[in-house]
């Protein structure tokens, strides 16, 4: 669906990832996993115009430790390598057995619980530092809750969200 101002979803305009690039992405993921000496299997698929790489296996807990720090770092690196100067291609998402979906649900629940605390105490509350993607999920969840507003604060990896009563 399009509107006068453009496509309803900006990713609708993006080109599908060519098969040879997808193979190269999977190979880079294999190389990273091998260098890290992790025992992980790698699958790839296109989902709703997004290139998804799934990593699974016995070393999955190492990949997801620290709120998915290694997984997030790998995803960042793979996107930098394969999308620099090629924004027409969709973002590359690295996941591990639906970790991203579970993490999003956790963040929405965190936003709901934190907003309840802010509303009850009528005092601001700062959350732990988060990645830009995680902060976006929390901001969107908080935007749907009446009586609170949110603001990102800090710099770099220490950037976090503070929730205020409206």
Language-model-derived ranges and their functions:
Residues 1-166:
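RNA-contacting regions in translation and RNA-metabolism proteins
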């Amino acid at each position: 669906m399009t509107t006068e101002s453009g496509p309803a979803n900006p990713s609708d305009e993006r080109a599908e990832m060519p098969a040879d690039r997808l193979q190269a992405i999977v190979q880079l993921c294999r190389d990273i996993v091998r260098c890290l000496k992790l025992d992980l299997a790698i699958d790839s698929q296109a989902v709703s115009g997004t290139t998804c790489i799934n990593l699974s296996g016995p070393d999955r807990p190492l990949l997801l430790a620290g709120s998915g720090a290694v997984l997030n770092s790998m995803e960042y690196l793979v996107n930098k390598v394969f999308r620099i100067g090629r924004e027409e291609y969709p973002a590359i998402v690295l996941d591990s057995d639906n970790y991203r979906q579970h993490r999003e649900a956790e963040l929405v629940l965190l936003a709901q619980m934190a907003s309840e605390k802010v509303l009850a105490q009528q005092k601001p509350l700062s959350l732990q530092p988060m990645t830009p993607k995680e902060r976006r999920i929390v901001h969107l969840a908080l935007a749907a809750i009446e009586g609170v507003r949110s603001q990102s604060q800090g710099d770099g990896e220490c950037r976090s969200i503070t929730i205020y009563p409206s």
